[in-house]
Swiss-Prot record:
CDD domains: SANT, ZZ_ADA2. It comes from Drosophila melanogaster (Fruit fly). InterPro entries: ADA2-like_ZZ, Ada2/TADA2, Ada2b_C, Homeodomain-like_sf, Myb_dom, SANT/Myb, SANT_dom, TADA2A_B-like_dom. Component of histone acetyltransferase complexes containing Gcn5 and Ada3. This is Transcriptional adapter 2b. GO terms for biological process: chromatin remodeling; regulation of DNA-templated transcription; regulation of transcription by RNA polymerase II; wing disc pattern formation. The gene is Ada2b. Regulates the transcription of a subset of genes during development; affects recruitment of RNA polymerase II. May be involved in the function of some acidic activation domains, which activate transcription at distant sites. Involved in the p53-dependent apoptosis pathway response to DNA damage by genotoxic agents. Pfam families: Myb_DNA-binding, TADA2A-like_3rd, Tri-helical_Ada2b_C, ZZ_ADA2.
Length: 555
């Protein structure tokens, strides 16, 4: 049987010593005795060889009947050389394969391999079982384009919208989709001199793998930047000066917002980035609109048609408060002569005769007011801290003589000597007067004589109780010293603490009970009411717990 080694072995005729090409005649009785067909036909006999010895025809690989039958069949030697050349030079490199075979052209080599080893019997017996053993991947994404594997997400990026001159200036090659000078051009230097060797230690191998990993990361960054350039069309925007900061139809606030948010564009595609900006701008518009609607509802408006008249009214009354969510500051307080308060006055500034004017008007609201009756307007939370009392001002009120005076006034008011004195003290609580900032010393001077005669107050109170029990509400007034009467008269003219004219009777009683100044109470009330109108917020929960703990709320 002929082996692969025999295919490339040269044989010579023992009789004529010529090279045997093709079939030779081998003597079965003599050792290493081969004859060519010409010498065998002539009946040559040499040495011990006789022409009547047994013989057999041997094929050296050049016979046309060796592998494939038919017209134009290749010899076994040529088939072996074809397979070796394809393994060495690769499928498709038919020019080099033809040179390796030496007897066939490139077209013949391609046709022979495709017909015999791909589409022929060998190909059907070899490739078909291999294809059937491959795992089958099932597409579970469906027909819709939603999700990360949808058609929209996997679609190719749009081409750069530039002409040939602009591409030449940038060094951009459209067919290759790359630039002559790429981003981070020195990245290839990390692995340009790397080569694996059998003498490398484990540390050397790990170091080379680390270099490859760094190079891969830099390639990813290069690809990411190229994707952003293509997705956002930065090249065309550069030449046409159509960046986002100069887009037509954008306000100054929108341009500033887009400039601040531009750093996040690297995490989104162009369409996602535009949708995100549009959503954020829409959210801001809805918040502003919600604040406007809250302001309208705060002022008692329930129909959109009423808002136009309300805005016209708020524009004319520039110093009136239209609610905690509005912009038109108004003031429902007037002086006794009907003039408006100066614009420079704050919420906590003293306001003379506020409740007298309200009572004299018969409880009617001001003609310029749209808010409901008996509605206390607070400062606009959208404004700066100008409407809130300063820290030094609040600290001066806390623990001041005015606060002590308010408590002592309440104690003295409880010592009612007669009905006239009771009426006078009560009218002092209802009638609000101006409180100068330097009233602390005067209040101390008025209260000092009272503190020196506590027994007089106690004895007068006991004497009045005895007379009421005995006389049943007689009009006789017990005798008192002239000094005590003078002090009680002076109590009627004591000024109230700042901010008292803005509080109701219940709120004043609450301030007295918990020993806090009206300005402090107004500040706390302003902070509580000017927050976002949302229920269940952490701020609301904290304040509610604090109020319940202090006893301001029952539940």
């Amino acid at each position: 049987m002929t082996t692969i080694a025999d295919l490339f072995t040269k044989y010579n005729c023992t009789n004529c010593q010529d090279d045997i090409q093709g079939i030779r005649v081998h003597c079965a009785e003599c050792e290493n005795f081969d004859l060519c067909l010409q010498c065998f036909a002539a009946g040559a006999e040499i040495g011990a060889h006789q022409n009547n010895h047994s013989y057999q025809f041997m094929d050296t690989g050049t016979s046309i009947l060796s592998v494939f039958r038919g017209k134009g069949a290749w010899t076994a030697r040529e088939e072996i050389r074809l397979l070796d050349a394809i393994e060495q030079y690769g499928f498709g490199n038919w020019e080099d394969i033809s040179k390796h075979i030496e007897t066939k052209s490139a077209e013949d080599a391609k046709e022979e391999y495709v017909n015999k080893f791909v589409n022929g019997t060998i190909g059907r017996a070899t490739w078909t079982p291999a294809q059937s053993q491959r795992p089958r991947l099932i597409d579970h994404t469906g027909d819709d384009d939603a999700g990360p594997l949808g058609t929209n997400a996997l679609s190719t990026l749009p081409p750069l919208e530039i002409n040939s001159d602009e591409a030449m200036q940038l060094g951009y090659m459209p067919n290759r989709d790359s630039f002559e000078r790429e981003y981070d051009p020195t990245a290839e230097q990390l692995i340009s001199n790397i080569s694996l060797s059998s003498e490398d230690t484990e540390v050397d191998v790990m170091l080379k793998l680390a270099h490859v990993d760094i190079y891969t990361r830099r390639l990813r960054e290069r690809a990411r930047r190229k994707r952003m350039v293509r997705d956002y069309q930065l090249v065309s925007n550069f030449f046409r000066n159509r960046n986002y900061a100069q887009q037509q139809g954008l306000t100054k606030e929108q341009r500033e917002f887009r400039d601040r948010f531009r750093v996040y564009a690297q995490f989104y595609t162009c369409n996602e980035y535009e949708r995100l900006l549009g959503s954020l701008e829409r959210e801001k518009e809805l918040r502003i609109r919600q604040s406007e609607l809250y302001r309208y509802r705060y002022n008692g408006l329930t129909k959109i048609a009423e808002c136009t008249h309300f805005e016209q009214h708020a524009a004319t009354a520039t110093h009136r408060s239209t609610g905690p969510y509005g912009h038109g500051k108004t003031d429902h307080t007037h002086t006794s002569n009907g003039s408006h308060r100066p614009p420079s006055s704050s919420l906590h500034s003293p306001q003379p005769n506020l409740r007298k004017v309200e009572m004299s008007s018969g409880g009617e609201a001001s003609s310029n007011s749209i808010a409901p009756r008996n509605t206390l307007h607070i400062a606009d939370p959208t404004c700066s801290g100008a409407l809130l009392p300063s820290k030094n001002y609040l600290d001066s009120c806390r623990g001041s003589s005015a606060a002590t005076m308010l408590q002592t006034t309440g104690m003295v008011m409880g010592v009612t000597v007669d009905s006239g004195a009771t009426t006078g003290v009560t009218s002092t609580a209802t009638t609000m007067a101006n409180l100068p900032t330097n009233s602390a010393k005067g209040s101390q001077q008025h209260l000092q004589p009272l503190q020196q005669h506590p027994q007089l107050l106690q004895s007068g109170n006991q004497h009045k109780m005895q007379n009421e029990a005995a006389g049943g509400g007689s009009d006789q007034v017990p005798s008192m010293s002239l000094k005590l009467r003078t002090q009680l008269e002076e109590l009627k003219h004591l000024p109230q603490p700042p901010g008292s004219e803005l509080l109701s009777h219940n709120e004043l009683d609450l301030c007295k009970k918990h020993n806090i100044t009206p300005t402090t109470y107004l500040s706390v009330k302003t902070v509580c009411l000017s927050g976002a109108p949302s229920l269940g917020s952490p701020m609301e929960t904290s304040l509610r717990k604090f109020f319940i703990k202090c006893g301001w709320l029952s539940h």
